[in-house]
Each structure stands twice: as C-alpha cells, then as structure tokens.
C-alpha cells in the first residue's frame, strides 16, 4: 500500500513537472513579446544603452546575491567554462539587446519583433553547418518563407525613410548576437548549472552594456512611474525569467528547436503594440508577419523527429 502511494505521488509529480515543461515555450513567448512594448515605454525617458545597462547590471546583482545566499560553488565554471559563459552572455544579453533597443527609438515595435523572428531561421541554418543538426525539406521551406517575409518589410522600410531602414538593420545586428550566443551556448555551455552560468553571463553582459552606454551615447534619464515599471519588468521578468526559460529549452533540446519558439513572438508583439501602444499595422507588415511566423512554425513543427537527437543525447 505504501509503495502504491509512493508510486502514485511520483507519477503525479512527474505529470506536474511535464506540464510545467510544456508551458515553458508559451511563457517565454509572452515574456519576450512584452519586452518590446515595455522597452518602448521606458525609452521615452531613458537613452537606449543606459536602459540596457541598468537592466543587465540589475540582473547581475540579483543573480550574484542569489549565488551568495544559496552558497553555490563556482567549481562548475572551472576549466575555462566561465570564459565560455562570459562570451555567450556578451553575445546573447549585450549585443542581443543593445542594437534593437537603439532601433526601437525610431522603429515600430512590431517591425523590430519581425526582424527578431529571423533568430530561429538563422540558428537552424547555422546549426546545420556548425553543430551537425539536420533539417527537413519543410524546414528549408520555412527558412525561405521567413526570409521573404522579413525582406518584404525591410524593402518597404527602405522606401519609407533612412531612419526606419537603419533601425531594422540594427535589429538584425541584435539577431546576429542572439544567433551567435545561442550557438555558442549550445556548443560550450550546456553542461553548466543554470544559476552559475547565468550569473557569469549577466556579469559579462553588464560590463559590455555599461561600457557601451559610457562610450556610444550621451546618457539621459527621467525617472517616472512608467520608466521604473519598464526597467523592473524587463529586468526581473524578461531578462531573468525569460532567459532562464530559454536556457531550460536549450538544455532540453537542440538549438533550432529552442529558438523556433520565436515563431509566435512577431505576431504576439504586434498585437500587444497595436493594443497598448496604438501602433498601426500596414498591409505589407501584416503580410510579412504572417510569412515570417509561418516560416518559423515550419522550422518548429518539423523539429521534433529529426533535430537535436544527436545533440541532446
């Protein structure tokens, strides 16, 4: 009887854990999409690189305190692993945030989110070349479709204004940071405990972000309730919560499968921007969003049977 009760409790625990794991991608999409909206609000009163620097320093401080309180060892970062985590953090959290935040000053959030949808497409393509992952025909179709969707919006932006085009180019630089950081993490950091790895990543990113704010802009700030709320949300919920969820997805699967969860981000961010910021969506942007999201979905839907089997085992 006692053994049956123990087995029942174990089954319930496993079911609960499995259910939590299944909703991780949805939670990530909602958090990541919201960051474009709250960043827009914060950038009304904060210069972009200062916004990013405060966000990254806040994350680094919180995680360092958690490390001290929990008395976690730094030993898992021995043998040069700390360096790999630092590189991944600089790419994912510094380059991946600094460029698109500058872009958000002049470019609608929906269009920035659309360019960010290139992340799973480029990650999947690079995974084939660098990590020996394999893609199915449907996923190659998804890559082409997504690129066409983003190209449609970028082409239209080039005709609208130079500032809009520059913003989208900066957003693409952020994508390159995310892709490089994702691949680097998948290659060198997957066996590092989450807390230790994340702490080093944010310490590195905070250093790069602070240096960028000091050298690349003239910082300005005006603290309002909206600004404070935006900084807190993007620091605690998006950077800490969102990147933790992303790391969980990376550890449990291939880099292509993890980053493919971005396919819902453009549409979700566009709807949030329309509802909360009053951003209007032109016909070509809507078409581009649909094409890019469909492309990312194709990459994601076909990932399970083929992608990551060799990497995750």
Range-by-range predicted roles:
Residues 23, 27, 53-58, 83, ...:
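Hydrophobic residues within alpha-helical transmembrane segments
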Residues 52-54, 93, 97, 110-118, ...:
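Helix-helix packing/entry segments at the starts of transmembrane helices
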Residues 30-61, 106-111, 180-205, 218, ...:
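Juxtamembrane helix-loop-helix junctions in multi-pass membrane proteins
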Residues 35, 58-62, 115-129, 144, ...:
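Alpha-helical transmembrane segments of compact multi-pass small-molecule transporters, enriched
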Residues 1-27, 61-88, 101, 105-106, ...:
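Membrane-interface interhelical linkers
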Residues 6, 63, 126, 135-157, ...:
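Hydrophobic transmembrane alpha-helices of multi-pass small-molecule transport proteins
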Residues 47-59, 102-119, 164-176, 226-236:
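Structural signature of hydrophobic alpha-helical transmembrane segments
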Residues 33, 37, 64, 89-94, ...:
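Hydrophobic/small/kink-forming positions within alpha-helical transmembrane segments
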């Amino acid at each position: 009887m006692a053994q049956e009760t123990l087995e029942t409790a174990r089954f319930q625990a496993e079911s609960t854990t499995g259910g939590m794991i299944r909703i991780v991608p949805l939670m990530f999409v909602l958090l990541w999409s919201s960051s474009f909206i709250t960043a827009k609000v914060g950038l009304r009163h904060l210069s972009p690189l200062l916004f990013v620097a405060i966000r990254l320093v806040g994350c680094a401080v919180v995680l360092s305190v958690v490390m001290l309180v929990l008395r976690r060892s730094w030993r898992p970062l021995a043998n040069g692993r700390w360096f790999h985590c630092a590189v991944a953090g600089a790419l994912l959290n510094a380059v991946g945030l600094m460029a698109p935040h500058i872009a958000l000053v002049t470019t609608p959030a929906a269009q920035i989110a659309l360019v960010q949808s290139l992340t799973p497409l480029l990650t999947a393509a690079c995974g084939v070349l660098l990590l020996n992952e394999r893609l199915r025909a449907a996923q190659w179709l998804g890559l082409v479709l997504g690129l066409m969707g983003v190209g449609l919006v970028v082409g239209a932006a080039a005709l609208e204004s130079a500032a809009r085009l520059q913003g989208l180019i900066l957003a693409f630089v952020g994508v390159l940071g995310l892709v490089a950081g994702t691949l680097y993490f998948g290659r060198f950091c997957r066996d590092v405990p989450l807390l230790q790895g994340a702490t080093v990543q944010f310490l590195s990113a905070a250093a790069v972000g602070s240096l960028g704010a000091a050298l690349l802009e003239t910082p300005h700030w005006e603290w309002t309730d909206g600004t404070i709320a935006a900084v807190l949300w993007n620091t605690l919920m998006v950077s800490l919560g969102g990147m933790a969820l992303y790391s969980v997805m990376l550890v449990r699967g291939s880099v292509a499968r993890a980053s493919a969860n971005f396919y819902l981000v453009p549409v979700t961010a566009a709807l949030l921007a329309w509802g909360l910021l009053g951003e209007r969506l032109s016909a070509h942007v809507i078409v581009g969003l649909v094409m890019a999201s469909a492309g990312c979905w194709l990459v994601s839907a076909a990932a399970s049977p083929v992608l990551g089997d060799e990497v995750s085992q």
